[in-house]
């Protein structure tokens, strides 16, 4: 063994013992003829002292520079009074070094590891192997390892089997674009990288493996956001012979145990909320319950007003008119209101009406807004009473299609909560249930809200008769406004699966071509089954307080789905393309 201890393992109990450390020189200091080296490894840092009494070792220490890889042997001793470093786990001790071996020298890093705040993300990703040396980055990956270990331990203890499913499979419509892999041996045919192990885990249920899990790599060729990557990791779980309440209870126990083990946080029982209630009160199917602001529908008070902006949507069943009260917001300057108006425009809102409540006792005279002249005073009072407005508040309004208003004011609610520091707690887990089975498109066609394999809460005949109002047996776990995991009871009867396919516009021939293997499996005694998948990257992001999942993945892609370190994706030579039966067409230049 080249080392006896990690730096982070050193403490006062080792006083007087000889230790050997291996790591990187984090910092070098020369104080009054004594050289101090801070040595860093994956577990932490330790201070090593070299004095001139050992001339050869002192000279070696004098030559080392930051990021040199070294092996150091010395004796642990307590630091002198007043020299204890409370910010370092080993800050109560230091090592008196008497042997130093330089294992490798290092050029000056492209950015200092002690002063990283102003370094651009692209530079950090280009030199990710340097960036990961920073203690806060190493801490995140260590925590990620602890998280996966805790989850595996829980699932193993509860009788789940870790089963791997294929990476090379065939394309199936799951909502996003597939990454395609050309086949050399089957000219003109392509594999697809899996967006999830969905169908294979269902087939494992048919095969009798009634408790399955996998820490699975998944791939989606879609536009990136702060919480998206083209390849991501999923905690994939499937069970047979459990209903949704049992699956939710089991996975909730897993998350509660995880937070207790890793962060020493105790969660109570997670509240449940229907999709309809979440959209009505919060404008989102993943509400952040730390935020006390709520949307309040006021269409009934505006149906007969002489103001088409409100009256039109108030009389349209596909629209909503909603109010959002911000306590103490009446002092908000017009420039800030304009900023929020521009913000809701991102979500399709055509404007942002408002009423400043200066002094309610004065009636309309105590309200400041360009819209109050269009609304009878009695209706205004009813609206202000309903939202709980008091002097000093501002009330925002949205009036448009249901989806536009929900998304716009739902996003504004989140923005206001952060801007005005309204969050009431650090963690707010919950379940959202009773999702619609389908989303209706403008042309009257339907899209599966979750995926085509989710079971509805009705018979096939009822589903085909009333698809727009059918509810699914789906459930999402939400934490702080982020979807942590989503799942459902699956369809386990062939007739129901075919009915869902038909409603999605997938006719018999296409069903057989794309899903024949699944339909075959459902004929041979498929058990009732369901499951759930958690996004591991999102989970780690939340538990570490990172701002992006790129911060908790060792080697992530950029926002443009590229790796600036390896220069992937890259070109391949003509021979490889010929073997794959592929010919590239030159793009026509636009003049």
Swiss-Prot record:
* Residue ranges of the region described as Aspartate: 198-201
Protein name per the record: Aspartate--tRNA(Asp/Asn) ligase
Q: Which GO terms describe its molecular function?
A: aspartate-tRNA ligase activity; aspartate-tRNA(Asn) ligase activity; ATP binding; nucleic acid binding
| Role | Aspartyl-tRNA synthetase with relaxed tRNA specificity since it is able to aspartylate not only its cognate tRNA(Asp) but also tRNA(Asn). Reaction proceeds in two steps: L-aspartate is first activated by ATP to form Asp-AMP and then transferred to the acceptor end of tRNA(Asp/Asn).
What are the residue positions of the site described as Important for tRNA non-discrimination?
31, 82
What EC number(s) has UniProt assigned to this enzyme?
Answer: 6.1.1.23
Q: Tell me the organism's taxonomic lineage.
A: Bacteria, Pseudomonadati, Pseudomonadota, Gammaproteobacteria, Pseudomonadales
**Family recorded in the similarity comment:** Belongs to the class-II aminoacyl-tRNA synthetase family. Type 1 subfamily.
Compartments where located: Cytoplasm
Point out the gene that encodes the protein. Answer: aspS
Q: Which reaction does it catalyse?
A: tRNA(Asx) + L-aspartate + ATP = L-aspartyl-tRNA(Asx) + AMP + diphosphate
Q: Which Pfam families match?
A: GAD, tRNA-synt_2, tRNA_anti-codon
Quaternary structure (record)? Homodimer.
| Sites where the protein binds L-aspartate | 174, 220, 450, 490
GO biological process: one example: aspartyl-tRNA aminoacylation
Q: Which residues bind ATP?
A: 220-222, 229, 483, 535-538
**Listed GO cellular component terms?**
cytoplasm
């Amino acid at each position: 063994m080249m080392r006896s201890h990690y730096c982070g393992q050193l403490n006062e109990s080792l006083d007087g013992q000889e230790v050997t450390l291996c790591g990187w020189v984090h910092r070098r200091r020369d104080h009054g003829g004594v050289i101090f080296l801070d040595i860093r490894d994956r577990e932490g840092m330790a201070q090593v002292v070299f004095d001139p009494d050992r001339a050869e070792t002192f000279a070696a220490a004098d030559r080392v520079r930051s990021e040199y890889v070294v092996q150091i042997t010395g004796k642990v001793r307590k630091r002198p009074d007043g020299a204890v470093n409370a910010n370092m786990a080993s800050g109560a001790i230091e090592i008196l070094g008497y042997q130093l071996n330089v294992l490798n020298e290092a050029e000056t890093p492209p950015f200092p590891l002690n002063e990283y705040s102003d370094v651009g993300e692209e530079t950090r990703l280009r030199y990710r192997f340097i960036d990961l040396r920073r203690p806060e980055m190493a801490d995140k990956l260590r925590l990620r390892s602890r998280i996966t270990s805790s989850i595996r331990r829980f699932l193993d203890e509860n009788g789940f089997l870790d089963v791997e499913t294929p990476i090379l499979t065939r394309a199936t419509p799951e909502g996003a674009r597939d990454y395609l892999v050309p086949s050399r041996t089957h000219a003109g045919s392509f594999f697809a990288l899996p967006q999830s192990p969905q169908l294979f885990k269902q087939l494992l249920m048919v095969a009798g493996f009634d408790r399955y899990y996998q820490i699975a790599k998944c791939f989606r060729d879609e536009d990136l956001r702060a919480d998206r990557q083209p390849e991501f990791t999923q905690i994939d779980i499937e069970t047979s012979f459990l209903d949704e309440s049992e699956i939710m209870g089991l996975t909730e126990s897993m998350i509660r145990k995880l937070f207790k083990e890793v962060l020493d946080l105790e969660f109570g029982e997670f509240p449940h909320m229907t999709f309809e209630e979440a959209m009505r009160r919060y404008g989102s199917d993943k509400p952040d319950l730390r935020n006390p602001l709520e949307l309040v529908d006021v269409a009934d008070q505006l149906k007969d007003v002489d103001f088409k902006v409100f009256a039109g949507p108030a009389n349209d069943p596909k629209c909503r008119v909603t109010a959002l009260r911000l306590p103490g917001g009446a002092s908000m300057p017009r420039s800030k209101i304009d900023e929020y108006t521009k913000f809701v425009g991102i979500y399709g809102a055509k404007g942002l009406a408002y009423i400043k409540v200066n002094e309610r006792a004065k009636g309309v005279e105590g309200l400041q807004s360009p819209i109050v002249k269009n609304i009878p005073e009695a209706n205004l009072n009813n609206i202000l009473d309903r939202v709980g407005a008091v002097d000093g508040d501002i009330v925002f309004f949205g009036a448009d299609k249901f989806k536009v208003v929900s998304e716009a004011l739902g996003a504004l609610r989140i923005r206001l909560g952060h801007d005005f520091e309204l969050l009431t707690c650090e963690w707010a887990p919950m379940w959202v249930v009773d999702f619609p089975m389908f989303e209706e498109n403008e042309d009257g066609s339907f899209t599966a809200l979750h995926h085509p394999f989710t079971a509805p809460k009705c018979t096939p005949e009822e589903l085909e008769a009333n698809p727009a109002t059918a509810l699914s047996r789906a459930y999402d776990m939400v934490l702080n406004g982020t979807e942590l995991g989503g799942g459902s009871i699956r369809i386990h009867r062939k007739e129901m699966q075919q009915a869902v396919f038909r409603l999605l516009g997938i006719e018999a021939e296409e069903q057989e071509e794309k899903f024949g293997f699944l339909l075959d499996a459902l004929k041979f005694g498929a058990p009732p089954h369901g499951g759930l998948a958690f996004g591991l990257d999102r989970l780690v992001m939340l538990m570490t307080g990172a701002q992006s999942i790129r911060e908790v993945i060792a080697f992530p892609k950029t926002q443009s789905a590229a790796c600036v370190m390896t220069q992937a994706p890259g070109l391949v030579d003509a021979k490889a393309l010929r073997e794959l039966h592929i010919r590239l067409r030159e793009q026509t230049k636009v003049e």
